[in-house]
Amino acid sequence: MFYSIIRLSIYKPLITISFVLLISLFCSWKLFQTSLDIFPEFSPKLVVIQTESQGLSAEQVENNVTRPLESYLAAIPNMDYLRSESIAGLSVITLTFKENSDHNINRQLVLEKLNGVKNILPSNANTPLMMPLASSAATIMTIGFTSEEKNLLDLRTFVDQHISPALLSLNGVADVNVFGGYERQLSIILDKDKLLKYFISLESIIDHIKASNLIVSGSIQTPNQELQIVSNNVIPIEKIREINLLNDNGQYFKLKDIATIKFTAVKQISKASIEATDGIVLMIIGQLNADTVAITKSIDQSLSKLKALIRSNKIELHDQIFRPANYILKSLESILDHLVLGGCLVLIVLIIFMFNLKAALISALSIPISLLLASILTLSTGTSLNIMVIAGLAIALGEVVDDAIIDVENILRRLRENAKLKNPLNTLRVIYKASLEVRGSVIYASLIVMLVFVPLLLLSGLVGRMFAPLGIAYILAIFSSLISALTLTPALSSISFRKYTETKEPFVINLISPLYKKILSYITSFPKLYSIIALLLCSSGIILAPKLNFGFLPDLREGHFMIHTSSITGTSLSETMRIGDNISSKVLQIEGVKTISQWAGRAERGADTFGSHYSEFEVELYDLTGEKEQIVHDKIREVLINTPGISFELNSFLVERVDETSSGFTSPIVIQIFGNSLVNIDIASNKLHQGLLESNLLRDVQLKSVLDKPQINIEFNNKLLAKNNISLNQAKLFINTAIDGFIIDNYYEDVLLIPVVLLYKDENHIESIDYIKNLVLFNKLGQPIKLKDISEISITKG
């Protein structure tokens, strides 16, 4: 077969060249259409389930939500393992499936399980939600909004009404996590004095409000048509005020007679700032296998359409907070520049040694042809065009030209020998024989080189997912160069050297040949000695290898840093933001820092599930050299070290994402302690934490989960409840209503889902344990009873 291919290429060169040209054009066209990404999809097959549980502590969430869900989901087919996290108000369960499983089938199996799970959860828990299928890098772009004229409630409403829906409608966007601002709720704030006057229970008020929002349905049949019965279930605020209530005495009155009805802010679970100014931060999450560069362009186009609306509302858009696409394009440009430079160097060396421009060009032409074909073949395996693929092609740069050089050099040598003959043979016949002479060695050499990279394809887990595309790209580049050497090189040689009559060796070869012959003769005179020297050199390399510093990835210079800070557990959002604003102000003064943003807490449906003590910063840099980036890194680190009361991590985005994929955390080394007693786990973790802090080999040591978060514990006394004519359910409903409010219903206003919340509190109160103790509820006889008279209230740690 090889003989026929080479013969066709030499005797019908135009057919071969035309065919190669068509393939090259197709590959180029296909390459421009392919998706661009940073890394290959390196995360395992994950399904993440989040369950919001308003008002529940971390321990209550763990016992009443997380553990029941874990038991319910434990027997799903193809699941490798399950991990969970419980924080105040939120349960997160991450299911990891086998690598050979299918994403869609995995999600379908989990969804089927979730359909019947609501009955086993407490009433405080919302329906468990399966998070969108996101890419490994997750974040496509981070943007922010600030305003000097709008308050944070109006700013958040604007973002939720106009920005988030526009972004979510874009192809490739999986989710938008919104941090900061205040969401709206319709609050029904009860007046305790008027409650006593009209003598109506909370249960009765809730029932009346729910009934007013019932959907009326049905239809009637007339002789010639069917008429649907409808009633607008979305009641405007004016009509809510007019809802009729009926107490046990048969007295009718309006809701506005006992309550103030108005729009207020939902209790915050996150805050955000841009350059130390309060605002809204949006983290845009990409879908699995998303084209980061293309989606970034779509986002920019979408935002440009909204800029007039944004400006008219006196809002400032910050769209340069974090853009991974910049790093992708910069990396691709850098690698392509190096490929071009490498190709030029190869061409120069070939011209010097071959002393024949045509021969050098034929050999060098195999580089772009081989890399183009290898790129398309690699993409056909299902991977995207990413840094690892291009790195594989770059490594193969020096190899892909070898086959062509061997072929062309042997052709020229045989043609020179033929030219010296009295009766020279046909040049095409000489070219054909010369190509066949080296064909076996070229094929065997290519196969051996390809086999060296096969182990990369056999790696499993994160390492396999990360480096397999590099190995595939390299192997296919060598294979493509072999194809080029069998077809294009003989075809071009037959056209270029058809009338070749040169008999002299190239000048450089003539110059160095005598010296090389002397060295070779000397070495071959002492074969044992030089074999021992070679063996010693190899052995020393093996001995020194363990002493080298090893790392999974190099320190990437992305032009962007991620800062994670953690204060004492229980620190409020306001205090966390105060500390963060101080850090932001100092970091902005560092030369080379372009912008900085911060968010604290968590977003609904967000991947990061942390409490109010946790904060994350995005630091975007100007275009700097690697050395200057390191200087900025060190200065930021110095700012963080000198900030009291926090522990911190300072990473680049990609390294952090790889660490988070491998361990579930943003650190390269994670130690988890298991046990049956939270107290004992806390003691052991604190001892280990102190020991690790003393090590000189470690830095940024953090204790993520601690037990001593302060909380208010309310223990109801059944005897006192009975004595005061109050049921336990009534007391618990009162607590929910008085502290965070009781969500009665939801309704849509435009695209916003507005919760209707019943509140029983003094709007001007100062939240403290004394306020909790002195909360007044009314028993069935209308008598006022303080909460401290029916329960034990104390501050505990949990």
Predicted regions and their residues:
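Hydrophobic regular secondary-structure detector
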Residues: 1-113, 268-623, 627, 631, ...
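Generic hydrophobic alpha-helical scaffold/packing signal
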Residues: 520, 524, 540, 553, ...
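Extracytoplasmic
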Residues: 42-48, 56, 77-79, 87-92, ...
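Short beta-strand elements
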Residues: 37-38, 71-93, 115-135, 165-182, ...
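Flexible hinge/switch segments at interdomain interfaces of large molecular machines
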Residues: 36-46, 83-89, 124-148, 177-183, ...
